[in-house]
């Protein structure tokens, strides 16, 4: 009887009450790419990244002293999760005198069955390892 009540309660819950699926990604190397090629940073110059993305399109890519954050287009494609955000603001851009620091196009792709992904933001083009998670917990 309790199981039936629980099933009915879950069925009656609206889609808005279900938290979005979220992923947390971290890098083990730092790679930069431009039109003329790519290069990996030396281990002593490695900058760890903290990336959060959810299936409601929210994305945060943190590196250095701030984060590119905002809403991105989200798609599921054959076991891949893809986020694409245009001109996402950098959280410390107001402190910068660099006019290019205001925003960046951000792309994140995760192969959900493996937890392996790739992030591209402001010159960074870096492989990442990802796990499902809840932001702010763990």
Which sequence ranges carry the predicted segments?
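Hydrophobic h-region of N-terminal signal peptides that target proteins for export
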Residues: 2-15
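Short, solvent-exposed aromatic-acidic interface loops
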Residues: 29-32, 62-69, 120-126
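Edge beta-strand at a domain terminus
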Residues: 43, 120-138
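One face of beta-strands
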Residues: 23, 27, 115-117, 128
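Secreted/processed peptides and extracellular or luminal domains of membrane proteins
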Residues: 31, 39, 43-45, 65-68, ...
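Short, solvent-exposed loop/hinge segments that bridge or flank secondary-structure elements
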Residues: 19-59, 94-97
